[in-house]
From Swiss-Prot:
It is found in: Cell membrane. The chain crosses the membrane at residues 1-21, 28-48, 51-71, 83-103, 127-147, 154-174. This is Uncharacterized protein YphA. Keywords: Cell membrane, Membrane, Transmembrane, Transmembrane helix. The lineage of its organism: Bacteria, Bacillati, Bacillota, Bacilli, Bacillales. Coiled coil: none annotated. It is a multi-pass membrane protein. InterPro entries: YphA_Bacsu. GO terms for cellular component: plasma membrane.
Amino acid sequence: MEQFYYYWSMWFLWVLTTFIFEKTKRRIAVSVFILTNIILSIHDIALYFSLNAAYLMFFVCGCVYAGYLGMYRFRYIMVYLTLVAAYAFVYLFALYDPVWFIIKPEWAAVILIVLLTASVERNFEKQLVLFVLGMCQGELVYSFVIQKLAGAMAVGGFQWLNACSAGMILLFGISKYEHLASQIGQKSKRSNKGATKMS
């Protein structure tokens, strides 16, 4: 079942946003985005490439949200281009010499991009935008390069959707872990201050 990881990951994210997060307008927007993305995942749009509609939704919403967050500075553009190059490199290297890969190339690309994103950006929303845009544009670059060898191919199919949704959950987990670690660190500092005052 090719779309297994995508559907389970998106349903997991939908349950988180709908039942666990605080009731805000942003929560409603994210829930609607997830459900719409799941619905669109079975449709393809024929342009220069055959584009999956859910992939296109990720790309367009990522660009819009990047503009909303003001991510048009040189630093973000360089990080974004690095992520695109990393994604395309992993896939092209896997075609050239697949022996080096212990795991599937899509998972290697996701792990690499998640690590790069988490190491250069601390804000979770900006991490998410950088990750999604890097994955989207990287897939487009890879498809453009490989079409000369393999002919026309679908961009953003379920293989890509699986990897992208799993990467978003991984980023969410890293964000929550960092938040928890900072809270524990603050509590330990307070308890140490209290102990020194008592002594």
